[in-house]
Amino acid sequence: MGCAIVNGHTILLLVVDRDYRGQGIGEGLLRECEETIRKNGFEKVVLGVGFDYLMPGVPTSRQWAPSVHEHLDPMVNTAASDFFEHRGYVHAWGACNCFDMRMQLEDFCQNDHRIGDMIDGILYRWAVDSDLNEICLCADDACQYQDESFSKYYCNASLYHGDSHQRVLVAEKQGRIVGTLIVSIETEGKDTGNVGCTCVATAEAHQGIATRMVMLGTRYLRDIGLKHANLSYTYSNLNKMYGASGYEISTYYFMGEKVIKLCET
């Protein structure tokens, strides 16, 4: 009928079968989750992203800031986010949206360049093993003002094998790596590709490098015969960059948090 998964202070999943909703089952599961988190010594409950995650937050059609490039999945609505908001949870990202994007690759029409081309003095190519140190430096530099660095996502050795389902695209300027992107092939289902973990060195930001990497990676996915492309867990303003390739927002996320009182001892 329903289930929930807790890890540390995070509710990774809370779901009730459609036929059993409106009977208090979800509320009971939430109460048990909060009590478990409280007993484990935490003062805050997080929905979605925490020590680990299945999805960034609670899927919703609601947005917290004006947005563009939007084409929501018709199955997405505000029911789940309303459930948590009515029980004291707030969107922790303020006036910033979190969302997934997707596109049909038959609609991709940016055909001017492909991976391997030199564009405006920058070479866009597949990474090799010997690039790893520079890739990590680039990712750390790009994320220096964020809570999390993306360099850890680039450390898997299989990313640098030509036959892997995930590969790293880099932007190289005068022998130095200034941009990185992970391109994934059918890791999220048949006929579906993914681009993400986009990083550009701070000194090279706002020059179109990220937009170009996304276009080239997306063209590659189309050219090898995939039908769909997704990108997950991104946020306000980046939809413009991804939208230049044709991606549209498919679902928003309620990044819910709630402060709870510790158990008295």
Language-model-derived ranges and their functions:
Residues M1-H9, L13-L14, C143-V200:
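A conserved beta-strand-loop-helix scaffold within acyl/acetyltransferase catalytic domains
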Residues I11, V45-V49, V195, A229-Y233:
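Conserved hydrophobic beta-strand within the GNAT/NAT acetyltransferase core sheet
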Residues I11-G22, V49-Y53, C197-H206:
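A short, internal acetyl-CoA/4′-phosphopantetheine-binding micro-motif in the GNAT/acyltransferase core
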Residues G22-R38, V200, H206-R219, D223, ...:
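Conserved acetyl-CoA-binding loop-helix of GNAT-fold acetyltransferases
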Residues F51-M55, T187, N237:
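Feature marks short, surface-exposed loop/turn motifs that line or immediately flank catalytic pockets
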